[in-house]
């Protein structure tokens, strides 16, 4: 099983929306829909097909000294260290992770 990191620029046709052009990110195992977190804290339900795939992570992949661990729905990504301590990735860490891999896509955060 893999978890995917997606990035998004709000592409709706409502140019008057205060979120138009903002960047959003999501980590999810879903291939259809997911909740996308935007820079101002807004969360939107979005079809994955409208997002840009940034990176796939295997569930045993290392991020620093921790391994990727997934539980629950809508991209609640957790990391587990060598001592089996589990923690949820924070919003700031999600953005840092997106920025680490974003150069592989046309989207710039």
Show where each model-derived region lies:
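Basic/aromatic-rich interaction segments and small domains that mediate binding to polyanionic partners
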Residues: 2-52
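Intrinsically disordered, low-complexity, charged/polar segments
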Residues: 3, 41-59, 90-109
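Acidic surface patches and DE-rich sequence motifs
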Residues: 17, 29, 38, 62-63, ...
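Hydrophobic residues embedded in beta-strands of well-ordered beta-sheets
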Residues: 34, 43, 68, 74-77
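Short N-terminal "domain-start" leader segments
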Residues: 54-72
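A short, exposed loop/beta-hairpin motif centered on an aromatic-Gly-Thr core
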Residues: 77-89
């Amino acid at each position: 099983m893999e978890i995917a990191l997606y990035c998004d620029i709000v592409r709706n046709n409502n140019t008057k929306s205060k979120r138009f052009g903002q960047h959003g990110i999501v980590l999810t195992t879903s291939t259809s829909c997911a909740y996308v977190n935007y820079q101002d804290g807004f969360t939107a339900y979005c079809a994955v097909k409208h997002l840009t795939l940034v990176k796939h992570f295997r569930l045993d992949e290392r991020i620093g000294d921790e391994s990727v661990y997934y539980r629950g729905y809508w991209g609640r990504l957790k990391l587990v260290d060598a001592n089996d301590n589990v923690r949820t990735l924070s919003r700031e860490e999600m953005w840092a992770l997106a920025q680490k891999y974003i150069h592989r896509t046309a989207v710039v955060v």
